Structures are given as C-alpha cells and as structure tokens.
C-alpha cells in the first residue's frame, strides 16, 4: 500500500488583510438546527422549550369531552439507530431512531370530583424518525438526502402601497401570523379604511374596533384624538365655526326626549336644538391632530360611512361578512371573533411575529401608551378590553401566558391604523418585501417541527375519539397512541417534500453547497411561474448573508441562493453576518452578529480601508455603505467594518482566484461548474488557490481530521488508529473507552456516490507519527493534502488551432489520455431482488436453462458474478429464475417436478444483464436474505452475543470504578439527594471504598440528582458528573447494541417489504477524457473537447515542451473573465518555482505581483512566448499567452449522453416511439425536418418516417416481417395518431367517418 505523499508544497500567501475571526463550521446550519430540534444530547431536566419538546408540550395535555380523562406529557427519549449509515445505504433502509414518550394518564369516575382517582405512567412508542448523520444528511430508503432551508415571508406586519388607475395612492397593512387568519387593513379611493380577513369580504375598520369593545363613535374618535369640545353660543362667529362639522356624540334634549345622533352634520336648526337643550359645549369631530397637524380625515370618513353604531351591530356585520350567514345570537358572534384572533390554538403570531410587530410599531405603541395615560376614561376602557383578551387566551389554552402575548391585541390594531395614517401623510415609509428583515429562514429543525405539529394534531384527534368512546374501564396510555400517525407524516415529508432533495454528491463542494442552500420555493413559498424580477434580484441586505453570485442559471435563478461564508442563522430564523465595531473612527476587536434589521440605517465600511498603526481609520472621510447607497462619510460617523473580504460570497465563489477580475455572469457559471467536477484518478490541488480549499475540504467532512494530540498507532489502506493523549482534567476522548484513548477511523474505499462518482479515502500519516488537533489524517478522492482538489493544473496556450477550438471547443494533447490525467472512476450499482410471486418464489441460481456454460463462467453458486470479473454489455451479473405458467401447479405436479427436476417447463430466465454501452470491473457484490443462513444454531449465537456484551459491560464498570476512585477517594461529599429529594449521603461524608462500591450500582446512580453535585470542588464535580452521565449513556448504548445484534439474528437481514433476497453488484468504470466531454476552468470558461491531438502535433515552446491544452483566445474578451489570464500566468510562475499561491478574493495578488513572480521564475513579464506549430515546426506569427490553468472535467460525459435506437418501446396511446436515453427512445422528427425532406422531394422517405417508422402499428410489423424474409416492403397503413384524432373528435360529440373509397 502506497501512503500518499504528505509533504506539502511551500505556499506563498498574497492576502493583504488578515481576517479577525475564522468562518464558522460550514455545516453548522444543518447540524445545529437538527440538534436544537431534537436535543438528544441534553439531559431531560435541561431541555429548553424549543423544537420537539415545545411541539410535544403544546400537543398535550389531551382531555375527553366529559372531563374524566387527562393524558399528560412528561418527557421523550430516543434509542440508538438499529443499523449504521453504511448498512442502511446497502440494504435500502432509513437511518432512523425510535422515539418514545413518557405519558401520564389520570382518570376519575365523575367530572365534578376534585381529585383524580388513579394515574398510570407509561413509556409509549411514537414511531421511528429519520436521524441526521454527522455530515448533515438523512438516509431515506437507502438514498442520502438533504433538507434544504426555506426562505419565506416572515410573520409580522407589512405595509405596502398601490396606485389606483386614477393616480391616487392606496396603502395597506397586512398582519401575517404563523398560524391563523391573515388580516389586512386597506385604504381606498374614497379615503376610508377597510379590513379584509383571509382575503374574503371586507368591512370598515371602525366595525372591527366597535366589535372588539370600542362601542361608541366617541370612543373610536377619542383613540385617535379626534374629539374636540366646542363652546355653543348664539354669537354668529361661533355658530359659523360649528356649521358643517359633525357631532362626535349624541345630543339628548332632556325635556322633550329628542335625540340628535352622533355623526349628524351641524346645521342652524341643530345648533338651535343644542342651545334649547341647555348645552354649553358640544363634542365635534376634528380632522387633524393638534400637535402635529396630521390629517386624520380617513378615520372620520370611515366612521361616517359605518353602518354600525353599537357593539352588537358591529359584531353582526363581522360575523355575516366572514361566515356569509347571520349570527344565531350576539354571544356566538362575539365568541367567533374571539376564537379567530384571541385563541392561541387558532391564531398564533409566533415569537417572530410578535417580535416583528413590536419592532415595527414601537413608536406607535409608545405614543398610544403615552396618549392613554392622559385620557383616563379611554385607558379604563382599553384595560377592560385587554383583560377580556387575557381571559379569552386562558380559556382556550392551559399554558401560562408569557411575557409576550402571541395573539393579536387591540393595541396592535390601533398602532397599525396610526401607522397607516402616517403613511397617508407621508410621515412614514412602506416596507420592502425583499428586505431580509421581512424574510426569514425555516431550516430543517423548524420544518420537522411543523410536520410533528400536523402528526400530533391527528394523533390528538384519535386519542380524544378513543377516550370519548371508552367507559371508565381501565386503560393505559399505550392503548390510546397509534405510532403510525406521527411517523407516516414525517416519512412522507422526507420522501416527497420539495425541500427534501436527493443529495448532489458529485464532489465534496457539491455536497456542501447543497446543505447550505436557501430556497424561496417549496410549501408556503413562491412558485417559479409567479416569482417576478424583484424577488429574484440581488438586494443590498444580501451583503454578507446571501451570495450575490451563486444561483442556478435556469428558471430558478435568484430563487435558490447560497449562504455566504460567514453567515449564520439566529434563533428567530434571520440571517446574520459579523461586523467589527467602530467607535469614533477607532476600529475595535469586538465582533457583533447583525441581522438585516440591526444593520438598517447603520454605516459600514469595507475591510480594505486603510488603518493607521493604532487601528484608527486613516482617512478623514471614507466611502461607506448604508442601505443601498455608497456615500462619502466622515470616519467618526462609521458604525461597523466588515470582518473579511470573503464575507460577501459563498464557499463556491470564494474558491475562484482573481474573482474580482471576472464578470458576475461568468463567476456564477464558475461557481456552479465547480460543483459538477468529477473526482479524478489522482487528485491535484491547484497551484493558484484562494485559501478556502482546506476549509471546504474539512467542513464537508471529506477528509479525516485528528481530534486532539496523539500518536498514530497503526495505518493500513482502510483504517487508521490514533492513540490520543488522555488528560483526566480536560479529556477530549472518553475516559471510559475500552482502548484507553485509541480511536479507530475506518476509511471509505471505492464507495459509490449518489451521482455514481467514486468516493475513496487514502491515509496521509504513517505509523508512530505525532499528530495534533486539526491535522489531516486521510485524504479523499477530491482532496490533496487536506485541500479541495477538483481538477488538474495543465499547460495551456490561448490560440486558435485549425478551427478545432471554434465556439469554445477545446483541443487536448494525447498525453492527457495516456497519463490518465483526466481519467475518472465511476461506480455503478445494479440490484436484483427475489420476491414471492403468486406462482411461487423466484430464485437466485447459476443453473439457468438454455444458457451456455461460457455465459455462466463468472457466476458463483448463488448465481452472483464474482468480484474482479471484467464484464461488458449483455453479460449476466445475477442469475435469476422466476416461475411462469398459465395455471398454478397441482400438488401432484409439484411432486413430480421436485423428483424429476423438470425446471425448464415452469421457469423463465429473469437474469440481470449488463446494460448497453457499459463495461467495467466488478468491485463488490452483496447478498442480503431474510432467511439468514447460519452456521451455528440461533441459540448458540444468542449465547455468544450475551457473553460478548457481558464482558464489555464488566470492562466498562471496572473503568468507571477506577476513574471514580481517582476523582473521589478520600474527599468529602456535599449532601447527595435523590431526584425525589431524599438524602442519600449526608453532607461531609468522607467517600471511601464502601461508598464508591455503592456508586457502581446502577439503581443508586440513576436516582441521584446530579444538579446538586457530588463534592465541593467545582472542577472535580464537573468531571465526576460528566463521567456519571457518560457511564449511564454507555450502559444504555451497550444494552441497545445487544438487543440490535439479537434482533438481526432472529430476523435475518431487514429488507424493504415484499423482498425476500436482494443482490447488489457494483461495477467500476475507468473513463478517460474523450471528444465530446465537457471541461471548464474556475472562471466560467467552459467548452467541449473538440479534438485530441498526438503529442507531436501540439504547439510547442522553444525548449520543445508541447502544451497540454489549446483554448480559443476569443473566449476571453467578450466574456470578460480576465481572472483566467491572471491565473494562467501566476500558475506558470508557481510551476517553475515549485510553489503554490494563495490569492484570496478581493485581497489577492495584483498585476504587478504576478509580473514580479513571472520574472522571478525567469519567464517573460507579459506571460507571452514564441510557440511553434507541431505539424510543420514553423514558428507562429505572434507570441502566445501560455501558462498553467486549473481545468476541471465535468459530469456531462459523452458516454452518458450518446445514444442510438433501432427498435424499442412505444407510447401506449399514440404508439409513437418514446423519447430520451432513459426510455431508450428515438430521435424526434419534427416539423422542420419534414420541411427539409419536402424541399428535397423525398416523398417515400417522408412517408416511411410518418408511418412505419413511427405509429403505423400494422405496417411496422409487416415491414419487419418483410425485412426478415427479404421481401419488398408493403404499402404503409393508417398512423395510430390519426385514430387518436378521430377518437378525440368523437369524444367531442362529432361523428367522423373515414371514406376510403378512391374517387
């Protein structure tokens, strides 16, 4: 075995700016989200109210309608996965864990009894849920999948504007909850505010305020400070002032009982009536607010047009508009309104929604609160309404009301109306829906929580039905719960959701990008047909959060993005990016994470600005960034500074050297095409890199990294053993490990990826080598010395070559084929299964009737091809026979066949063959069977397993005892209590051998309350508690493992339903580069191989060195990706000097530095040299740009695309041949091709094309027969598509007859 060369090439770093912080783990997005949801490593008592815990708490308690039963939730736990990740992939199973919840069922005989009669506590199985691997993926039915994060509209309030055709602006405010009805307030052309609930019918906003409790006009007007008390007098000047105004409250003449209603326009007669009634002052409506002169006529217009005048009338209006029928009574209407907005089970703003409303309306809410303080009568009414809302919440929900109320309150509604008034007056701005403050990310944990909510709601419904149908006979929680309810919802999410994707595993970068992707599509998101330009465009808030470069090129452009390198997602789902704090021009080392909302209105500067020796901004004024603008500001005004030049882009874009010299469109292609690069036979890191290569390789988990300081103990081709240094005070590895700190790393060997590329690891270390934390122990098929290596450094010349590199085609040297430079390995998987059919069971066998011995030479006794066999198309991979026969055989026939072995008559050959166009070497075979073939009998195997695990448990106990003695012997204890509060060991007890022996007993350990500690020393306590927790965990793991091993023996191999045996064959193919393969650089410079030339025909330099690849120079200027020329020149200098370069984006090598290194290497500074034609030996007329460029071979290989058909499958209805390689289809002969044949007058060929070669069923059979017998071809018949047309016309009720009489 050859160990890979681990001596790294010296590297020259061009970075001008050192980043103050390192980027976070690039898979953190997936791993943190899932583990925060599942909280499996958190002790029960420390679990936060989030994720699964929160969902389960909200789903319980469940009661029946009679109030006799109460089912409460206590806690949940998981078992270990039954199979490893590799076993699940091989067997086509799901890598999952079983979820168990502890429930308590209480019951009583009569509902009015104060206490519960009896309670039963029980652990109930709730189904199996897929578990995330340490690479951030899920294994679902044997396929590795990724759940992509979704970018959707954040709950909260959004203000927008529209322009009516008459030019008037109309404003709207939409309150979007996490769950419940959408409510929209909208102004119209008549200057009124309407309310739309769930986009249904509308009613005036005053009706809603009235229905909530502000019953009188005066109350509503008072809320907006629109009531004015005016003196009434007989003086003409005062009378004129009153004329035309509207009354704010009713005027009652006590003597006559006459009423002048509110909203009445004041006339001379009304003034006389008011004076006659003895009123000195009267309350009228005013249109502007006195302090600020704000026009609030919209409220007055709305009130004047409101048909309701009392709370009851308003409730009826709201009910009728929403339910489209009359309310049975007022109480029903009121409870309907309360259920819609104040019941937390029906209407939930969520933490995010409440936070967004408070943040957006903070000024309006503060102003409202201050105003109510000045108006005691309104404050009293408002407080009474608030109390009623709180009462409603507690009626519908048993949960205590937290700090923030997650339902809508009247304060929110009034604040929204106030903000709308500000918008009308031009005193506020509408929201930008594409701003990242209004869009949040739903990562995997939140999406799973939503599925659990659906599943538990269904389960709750079933439980209630069961409880209601039960009499008071004794039942246990397990009788009520159906595990399928929840697990089926979760399984269908992983299998069918648009956001659960088959992982792109072409190379480690593709894998990682897939996990860091953010999609605006999916359930509850946008659809690509409806998404406009604005939502797809780059927004200024994307800076440092979403990559402006990496996005797909097709219909999904802009809808699918990638997280930037430093971006993180906070607990509310908003994307944050780090900034250094700047105070009065002084750049500090304090780093803060800012969301788009936090950054709004702040002034930030790039990391490239000049600082003096004291870290102050050197210039007096600098160009900064604020919102979408780039003003020149004073250094003292700057708030924040970027942390790194890489901050703006994603990992894939950060791998493109000289990105700053490339056009954005080409950089996009470069970032996308790196993900399609096929791992090559021998990986080679780029000479010109950006410094991100190692980060991507580590964070994608492609390489194996040392976890701490230690010594390599053993290295083979497929395993590395490292003995880590044990430090009892600060242990990086488990103290309870049976191997005393030795960790074994199994290397992946020739594993097939999802895209059929080959994943294989090779060791980089040797026996006895000392390693430290973070050292790379093993490389992957796409890494070189721990750096991402997707392609090869090849000698390039930019020149035309006899037209063969026209239109981006590429001319290659034959050397690249001979030396396997661009050769890749592809592993294909084939599977065949045995099922139990109605006519009997199928069988794997090499005994196949009517097949020559030569065809069976590579099959073993089970009929499976041997490892190492070279196979080509049509070779048998798995021999299989399947029963045939029109009728089921009688018992007598079965007996006779069993005796005489007459197999030929009743079985047919169903063997699996190598498909067309495939050849390769069998590298692995697997046979799984439900009927396990065991050498020893089951009982003996069980006993052996018990013995093995007893030894492991005894070893674990002795290790635990040893470390406990080391930590505790002779120390004084604190008061050790049980989890029920009972004192187990009094305070001050000296811990001796006897007490330590007690600790070894599991019942004693299980009952201890660890939160109080064991001894007084903090560090010792921490170590002991960690040791006890780990001991408990390891014992449980051993117990689970024991059960799993026994289960496997009893059951045999677990296979998908209906399959008795499963055979898998893996074939490895070596694919050399050939004409038609697609290649690309990292700058979006892609092309297809147009010609492979003999080495002697390639252009060569003065010293006779032929170039490896010739690219067309016309592919550079119009594409504006000059980065490839910088890379070419610097790569050549690096090759000559034997060094590598690290040129990070936006702070890398300059033109002068590239020239400097070219000259240092003895090369011309402009990078151009004389070249000679390999065919004639003559010098080319001009000098040519030559150098080393990093080229990738992409997964668009001609072998997978080339396809031809003679006969094959036909479409069922039209009887025309199918299309596409996957269906073994034909080439479409379209209308333009028909024109071409018409133009040549090729009538017979045309007739053949449209009939016998297409869908004339009878004609094609006759033609085939004629060809076989060597006869003349018959006349074509009627095409089937004509019959289809006739049937369709008949389906429309038209009678069509074919008149085939010749006139």
Swiss-Prot record:
It catalyses: RNA(n) + a ribonucleoside 5'-triphosphate = RNA(n+1) + diphosphate. It is an enzyme of class 2 (transferase). CDD domains: RNA_pol_B_RPB2 (cd00653). Belongs to the RNA polymerase beta chain family. It holds the Pfam family RNA_pol_Rpb2_3. The keyword Transmembrane helix does not apply. HAMAP family: RNApol_bact_RpoB (MF_01321). The RNAP catalytic core consists of 2 alpha, 1 beta, 1 beta' and 1 omega subunit. When a sigma factor is associated with the core the holoenzyme is formed, which can initiate transcription. The gene is rpoB. One of its GO terms (molecular function) is DNA-directed RNA polymerase activity. DNA-dependent RNA polymerase catalyzes the transcription of DNA into RNA using the four ribonucleoside triphosphates as substrates. Keywords: DNA-directed RNA polymerase, Nucleotidyltransferase, Transcription, Transferase. The keyword Transcription applies. It comes from Chlorobaculum tepidum (strain ATCC 49652 / DSM 12025 / NBRC 103806 / TLS) (Chlorobium tepidum). GO terms for biological process: DNA-templated transcription. This is DNA-directed RNA polymerase subunit beta. Its EC number is 2.7.7.6. One of its GO terms (cellular component) is DNA-directed RNA polymerase complex.
């Amino acid at each position: 075995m050859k160990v890979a060369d681990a001596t790294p090439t010296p590297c020259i770093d061009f970075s001008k700016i050192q980043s103050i912080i390192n980027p976070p783990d690039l898979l953190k997005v997936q791993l943190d989200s899932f583990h925060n949801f599942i909280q499996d490593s958190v002790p029960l008592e420390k679990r936060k109210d989030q994720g699964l815990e929160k969902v389960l708490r909200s789903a319980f308690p469940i009661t029946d309608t009679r109030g006799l039963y109460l089912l409460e939730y206590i806690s949940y736990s998981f078992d270990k996965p039954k199979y490893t990740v590799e076993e699940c992939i091989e067997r086509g199973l799901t890598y999952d864990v079983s979820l168990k919840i502890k429930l308590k069922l209480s019951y009583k005989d009569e509902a009015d009894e104060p206490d519960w009669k009896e309670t039963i506590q029980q652990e109930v199985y709730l189904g199996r849920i897929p578990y995330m691997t340490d690479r951030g993926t899920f294994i679902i039915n044997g396929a590795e999948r990724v759940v992509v994060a979704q970018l959707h509209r954040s709950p909260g309030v959004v203000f927008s504007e529209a322009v009516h055709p008459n030019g008037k602006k109309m404003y709207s405010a939409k309150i979007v909850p996490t769950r419940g009805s959408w409510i929209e307030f909208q102004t119209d052309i008549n200057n009124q505010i309407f309310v739309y609930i769930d986009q249904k019918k509308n009613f005036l906003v005053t009706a809603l305020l009235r229905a909530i409790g502000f019953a009188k006009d005066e109350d509503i007007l008072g809320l907006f400070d629109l009531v004015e008390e005016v003196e009434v007098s007989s003086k003409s000047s005062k009378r004129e002032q009153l004329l035309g105004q509207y009354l704010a409250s009713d005027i009652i003449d006590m003597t006559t009982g006459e009423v002048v209603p509110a909203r009445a326009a004041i006339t001379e007669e009304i003034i006389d009536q008011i004076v006659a009634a003895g009123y000195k002052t009267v309350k009228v409506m005013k249109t502007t607010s006195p302090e600020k002169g704000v026009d609030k006529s919209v409220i007055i217009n709305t009130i004047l047009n409101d048909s309701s005048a009392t709370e009851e009338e308003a409730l009826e209006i709201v009910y009728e508009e929403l339910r489209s029928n009359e309310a049975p009574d007022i109480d029903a209407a009121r409870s309907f309104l309360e259920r819609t907005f104040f019941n937390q089970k029906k209407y939930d703003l969520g933490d995010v929604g409440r936070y967004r409303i408070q943040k957006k309306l903070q000024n309006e809410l503060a102003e409202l609160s201050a105003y109510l303080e000045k108006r005691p009568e309104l404050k009293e009414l408002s407080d009474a309404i608030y109390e009623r809302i709180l009462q409603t919440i507690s009626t519908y929900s048993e949960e205590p009301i937290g700090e923030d109320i997650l339902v809508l309150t009247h304060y929110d509604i009034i604040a929204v109306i106030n903000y709308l008034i500000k918008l009308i007056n031009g005193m506020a701005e509408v929201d930008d829906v594409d701003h990242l403050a209004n869009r949040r990310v739903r990562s995997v944990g939140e999406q799973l929580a939503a599925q659990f909510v659906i599943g538990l709601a269904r389960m709750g419904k079933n439980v209630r039905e069961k409880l209601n149908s039960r009499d008071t006979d004794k039942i246990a929680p397990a009788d009520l719960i159906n595990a399928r309810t929840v697990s089926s919802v979760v399984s269908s999410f992983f299998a069918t959701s648009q956001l659960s994707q088959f992982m792109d595993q072409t190379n480690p970068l593709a894998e990682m990008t897939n996990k860091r992707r953010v999609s605006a599509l999916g359930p509850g998101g946008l659809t690509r047909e409806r998404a406009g330009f604005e939502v797809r465009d780059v927004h200024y808030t994307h800076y440092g959060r979403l990559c402006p470069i990496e996005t797909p090129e097709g219909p999904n452009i802009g809808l699918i993005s990638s997280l930037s390198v430093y971006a993180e997602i906070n607990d509310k789902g908003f994307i944050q990016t780090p900034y250094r704090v700047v105070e009065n021009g002084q750049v500090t080392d304090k780093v803060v994470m800012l969301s788009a909302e936090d950054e709004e209105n702040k002034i930030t500067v790039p990391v490239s600005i000049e600082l003096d020796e004291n870290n102050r901004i050197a210039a007096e004024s600098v160009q900064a960034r604020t919102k979408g603008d780039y003003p020149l500001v004073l250094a003292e005004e700057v708030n924040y500074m970027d942390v790194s030049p890489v901050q703006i882009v994603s990992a894939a874009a950060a791998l493109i050297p000289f990105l700053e010299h490339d056009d954005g469109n080409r950089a996009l292609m470069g970032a996308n095409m790196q993900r399609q690069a096929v791992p090559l036979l021998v990986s080679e890191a780029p000479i010109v890199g950006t410094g991100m290569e190692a980060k991507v390789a580590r964070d994608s988990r492609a390489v194996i990294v040392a976890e701490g300081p230690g010594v390599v103990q053993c290295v083979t081709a497929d395993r590395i053993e490292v003995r880590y240094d044990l430090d009892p005070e600060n242990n990086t590895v488990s103290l309870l490990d049976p191997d005393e700190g030795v960790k074994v790393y199994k290397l992946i060997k020739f594993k097939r990826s999802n895209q059929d590329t080959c994943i294989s690891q090779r060791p980089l270390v040797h026996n006895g080598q000392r390693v430290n934390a973070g050292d790379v122990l093993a490389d992957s098929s796409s890494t070189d010395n721990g750096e991402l290596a997707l392609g090869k450094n090849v000698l390039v010349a930019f020149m035309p070559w006899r037209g063969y590199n026209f239109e981006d085609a590429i001319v290659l040297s034959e050397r690249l084929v001979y030396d396997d430079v661009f050769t890749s390995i592809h592993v294909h998987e084939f599977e065949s299964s045995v099922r139990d059919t109605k006519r009997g069971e199928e069988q794997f066998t090499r005994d196949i009737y009517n097949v020559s011995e030569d065809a069976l030479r590579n099959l073993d006794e089970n009929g499976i091809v041997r490892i190492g066999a070279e196979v080509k198309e049509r070779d048998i991979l798995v021999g299989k026979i399947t029963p045939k026969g029109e009728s089921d055989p009688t018992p007598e026939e079965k007996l006779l066949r069993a005796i005489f072995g007459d197999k030929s008559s009743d079985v047919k050959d169903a063997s699996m063959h190598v498909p067309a166009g495939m050849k390769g070497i069998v590298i692995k075979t697997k046979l799984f069977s439900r009927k396990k073939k065991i050498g020893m009998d089951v009982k003996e195997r069980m006993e052996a397993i018990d013995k093995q695990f007893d030894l492991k448990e005894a070893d674990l106990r002795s290790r635990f005892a040893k470390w406990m003695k080391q930590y505790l012997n002779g120390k004084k204890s604190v008061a050790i209590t049980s989890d029920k509060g009972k004192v187990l060991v009094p305070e001050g007890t000296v811990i001796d051998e006897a007490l330590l022996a007690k600790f070894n007993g599991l019942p004693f350990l299980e009952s201890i309350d660890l939160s109080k500690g064991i001894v007084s020393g903090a560090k010792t306590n921490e170590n002991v508690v960690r040791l006890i927790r780990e001991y408990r965990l390891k014992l449980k793991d051993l117990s689970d493992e024991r059960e799993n091993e026994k289960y496997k023996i009893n059951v045999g191999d677990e296979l998908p339903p209906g399959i008795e045996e499963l055979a898998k064959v893996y074939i490895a193919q070596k694919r050399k580069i050939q004409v038609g393969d697609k290649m690309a650089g990292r700058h979006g410079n892609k092309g297809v191989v147009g010609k492979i030339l003999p080495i002697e025909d390639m252009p060569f330099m003065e010293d006779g060195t032929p170039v490896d690849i010739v690219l067309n120079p016309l592919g550079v200027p119009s594409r504006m990706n000059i980065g490839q020329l910088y890379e070419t020149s610097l790569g050549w200098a690096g090759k000559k000097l034997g060094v590598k370069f690290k040129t990070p984006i936006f702070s890398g090598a300059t033109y002068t530095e590239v020239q400097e290194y070219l000259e240092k290497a003895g090369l011309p500074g402009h990078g151009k040299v004389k070249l000679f034609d390999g065919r004639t030996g003559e010098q080319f007329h001009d000098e040519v740009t030559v150098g080393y460029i990093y080229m990738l071979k992409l997964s668009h290989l001609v072998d997978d695309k080339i396809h031809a058909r003679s006969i094959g499958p036909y479409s069922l209805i039209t009887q025309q041949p199918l299309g596409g390689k996957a269906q073994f289809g034909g080439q479409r002969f379209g209308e333009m091709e028909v024109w071409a044949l018409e133009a040549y007058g090729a009538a017979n060929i045309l007739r053949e094309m449209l009939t016998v070669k297409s869908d004339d069923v009878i004609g094609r059979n006759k033609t085939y027969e004629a060809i076989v017998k060597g006869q003349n071809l018959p006349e074509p018949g009627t095409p089937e598509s004509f019959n289809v047309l006739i049937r369709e016309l008949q389906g429309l009720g038209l009678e069509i007859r074919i008149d085939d009489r010749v006139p």
